[in-house]
């Protein structure tokens, strides 16, 4: 019989939660003399932040049943004491509480100063016989893997746990039995980095004056879970808006004044630093389209970088290094046509460049990129052709009323009805019969009814 975490109530797990002499502890509260026996298996290598892959992040290949544990302090080791480290899951007996923590190396990101910063790793728990190391035996020395098991579990057989289907089963917030010591410098996803608050609640039962208060405090700590609430993102957004002095309940409207300010702010930047958007269009930033500026048409000229198709084009844009070192550059002095003639004239230079961006059909989104490029390259030519094919609307002369046309300087009023059109047609037999009756003399009908 396979077990599904969170699907059944486990009396053994519940009784285990009620037993014990305390709740979850933190590493800075633990005693120096901890039981770190190995039960006959090899000592696990300590997993540190320095052992993560230096080149970017890796993809978690399998779905864990529990939320992750994230490192927030460098140089801290991820480890649990003997018999600890297996999360609590309703429906899973203690005999199946065995598995390993898998280190997920997250990708790096670029900071404001242009440097690459590597995110600290995040650890996910998988039951023995599941996950990325399903075929490995318990205790195998693997970089980025830390084996854990309860004292009642048989580590020689895989755990009888089904794999999680993310479409039907949500991840369970990670919780541990009472007395578990978390690795220092780590926090459970969804619980925040509130270690001081957790330590204060852990000490609260010890400071309580009676056993009853300790029981009530422990009961409250048992029922609370560090899961992510649905409105947590809204609360964070409200706090950020409050710091900025804005009301989160009122929608931010872009008025003509704010749009004008945004447009002026963009136009005050140098030409090569402008980013056109809804408030400042492409033509306002860079002028009309032509042979020297031949990209853009339709909605992209109106929306600029706000166009939904623009981000995929931005993937083709060269970096600053590729621009300077991968292009042919030429410095030329040009005539200064701007400025007040009374002011001192400035020397104006142009850094002209000539290069190419090479890509092939293996590029992600290749078909979409080709479609967008074909729609916007030299689009101004098609627009001009379309304008030439459309006959211009005749302009109405001043003082001329609608519905009048001029022919040889004679104004003829437009007909207002079919009767006024006065179209000639031949008389039918019915018409002739009616005319004859009209010519006959009138005779009064004297017949009685």
From Swiss-Prot:
Ranges of Low complexity composition bias in the record: 9-22
Phosphothreonine PTM sites in chain numbering: 174, 428
Region of interest (Disordered), ranges: 1-55, 158-231, 266-297, 387-449
Main localization (coarse): virion
Domain CoV N CTD: 259-384
Localisation: Virion; Host endoplasmic reticulum-Golgi intermediate compartment; Host Golgi apparatus
Protein name: Nucleoprotein
Organism: Porcine hemagglutinating encephalomyelitis virus (strain 67N)
